[in-house]
């Protein structure tokens, strides 16, 4: 697995940073992406403050089957909504980000995958001294997605 990344900033984010969404959709459909990570960092120090990780287990045979894989679209959407509600609820315990931040989008792909030149290889960008929170999982007809997030433990003065 290789991590491919593209960068953006919170302030003045241009939607053209997402030029490659078609690539990501294709990678997900072909089960070529195993992990999607959003890393939030302090712009000035480059210190990683939050890391949102979504591990993706793809079933390459599922998309070739003509029969549906036992889950209705409503069930899948309900599971995804549940994860989104849980992500939204993290504001109750996450430290407030009081610095200007940027984000990196990392996608761990098959090593032999050809990627656009705007993507570059990256390290995992782990957080030193972090707290980790496991979030709910969900499954679709092709994927199982496990999610977790880590955040920088506040330093007591």
Kindly label every feature range from the protein language model:
Residues 1-157:
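Long protein-protein interaction modules used by eukaryotic assembly/scaffold proteins
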């Amino acid at each position: 697995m290789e991590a491919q990344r593209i960068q953006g900033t919170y302030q003045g984010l241009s939607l053209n940073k997402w030029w490659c969404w078609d690539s990501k959709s294709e990678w997900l459909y072909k089960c070529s992406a195993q992990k999607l990570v959003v890393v939030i960092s302090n712009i000035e120090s480059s210190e990683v403050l939050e890391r949102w990780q979504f591990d993706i287990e793809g079933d390459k045979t599922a998309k070739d089957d003509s029969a549906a894989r036992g889950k209705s679209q409503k069930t899948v959407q309900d599971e995804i909504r549940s994860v989104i509600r849980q992500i939204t609820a993290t504001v109750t315990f996450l430290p407030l980000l009081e610095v200007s931040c940027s984000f990196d989008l990392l996608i761990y792909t098959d090593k032999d995958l050809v990627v656009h030149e705007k993507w570059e290889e990256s390290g995992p960008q782990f957080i030193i001294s972090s707290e980790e929170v496991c979030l709910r999982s969900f499954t679709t007809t092709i994927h199982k997605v496990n999610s977790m997030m880590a955040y920088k433990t506040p330093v007591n003065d």
